[in-house]
């Protein structure tokens, strides 16, 4: 007997619908922490709207009754080219949020990247499923701490290390300022009132709020005081980081090493020349430099600069399966999605993240079928045209 889908699942029929549901479920300060960008949020909006300038040229007579979405990336097979990207404090959206999302990724057959600012630790996340696990790190003022995180990830069996290079300073996130939100989480009077109005979230998180911390920054034997830990984390950001630091990390980490936050073709070329194994074209979801271009807009120039020597991935504004298809047609090997996992968590925890991934899978399969594409390897630039990227006409 087939049971009907839960009511929330029937309503959550797109990533946009999931965002709206998360907005209704969360206190405003918590929702805005995930949803907001830097300053006027021009880059945040461009990440999504830029995909609309890219149009698909279908070839329906190719005959594609079956579609294969699987890829092989860094020697591991993934069921589809959609990876859960790193987001801090996922445990603020659902209890044990990071591990819920990681289990959903494992069940879906795809990879999960743990944020440096996760509530759970590297070691705790390593217990969640057998799918590929990646770890995000920064170059810290204390270079020894960078080494420590890399060594912990290696010991825990992580498949890849993701060095985020565009967070040397914290972006000016004005929604958080208006809401009185800070790290550690402090919501101000309006924020506290908003929390009180979200009874379901408040009840679910009643035992968690006081325990939320940045797990990877807590020293052995130290109380997990989030004020102490958050202060330590903020003080570690280092605007003096340079390519020599990347070289040192390359020596430490023997597995796949990716740079996240690459937008300039010259940086892409330099990264490959210095032995980097992969690039993630990203503007940090519009949360850092407002005025940076949309990730998808610069993707073709990064792909051209790399010339097939290493995989190129993309994040930023990927809200439809068709967005993934467009990115892959323009040369990306896979896309990362970050905010959508938080919306899934806010709605239904692990089940919400699993549903989010299934939406991408279904939409990708449908779009590929409508375009006459059977396999990921068949996606190419002949599938798309856009005025903003290369000026071609159909």
Which functions belong to the PLM regions below?
Residues 89, 103, 128, 144-314, ...:
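Alpha/beta enzyme core
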Residues 37, 115, 136, 261, ...:
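Active-site-adjacent beta-strand anchor residues
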């Amino acid at each position: 007997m087939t049971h009907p889908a839960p009511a929330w699942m029937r309503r959550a029929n797109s990533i946009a619908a999931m965002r709206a549901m998360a907005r209704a479920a969360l206190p405003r300060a918590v929702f805005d922490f995930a949803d907001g960008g830097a300053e006027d949020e021009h880059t945040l909006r461009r990440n999504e709207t830029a995909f609309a300038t890219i149009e698909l040229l279908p070839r329906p007579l190719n005959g594609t009754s079956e579609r294969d979405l699987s890829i092989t990336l860094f020697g591991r097979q993934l069921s589809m080219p959609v990876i859960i990207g790193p987001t801090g404090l996922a445990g603020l959206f659902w209890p044990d949020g990071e591990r819920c999302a990681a289990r959903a990724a494992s069940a879906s057959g795809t990879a999960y990247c743990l944020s440096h600012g996760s509530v759970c630790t590297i070691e705790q996340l390593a217990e969640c499923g057998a799918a590929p696990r990646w770890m995000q790190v920064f170059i810290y003022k204390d270079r020894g701490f960078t080494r420590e995180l890399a060594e912990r990830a290696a010991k825990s069996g992580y498949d890849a290390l993701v060095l985020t290079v565009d967070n040397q300073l914290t972006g000016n996130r004005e929604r958080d300022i208006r809401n009185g939100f800070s790290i550690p989480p402090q919501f101000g009077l309006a924020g506290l009132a908003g929390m009180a109005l979200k009874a379901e979230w408040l009840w679910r998180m009643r035992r968690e709020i006081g325990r939320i911390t940045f797990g990877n920054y807590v020293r052995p034997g130290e109380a997990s005081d989030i004020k102490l830990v958050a202060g330590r984390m903020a003080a570690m950001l280092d605007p003096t980081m340079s390519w020599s630091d990347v070289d040192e990390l390359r020596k430490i980490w023997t597995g796949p090493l990716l740079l996240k936050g690459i937008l300039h073709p010259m940086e892409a070329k330099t990264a490959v020349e210095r032995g980097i194994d992969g690039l993630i074209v990203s503007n940090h979801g519009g949360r850092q430099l407002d005025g940076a271009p949309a990730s998808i807009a610069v993707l073709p120039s990064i792909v051209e600069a790399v010339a097939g020597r290493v995989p190129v991935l993309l994040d930023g504004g990927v809200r439809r399966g068709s967005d993934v298809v467009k990115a892959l047609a323009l040369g990306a090997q896979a896309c990362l999605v970050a905010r959508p996992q938080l919306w899934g968590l806010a709605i239904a925890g692990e089940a919400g993240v699993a549903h989010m991934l299934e939406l991408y899978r279904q939409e990708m399969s449908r779009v590929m079928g409508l375009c006459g594409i059977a396999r990921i390897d068949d996606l190419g630039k002949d599938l798309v045209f856009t005025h903003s990227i290369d000026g071609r006409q159909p």
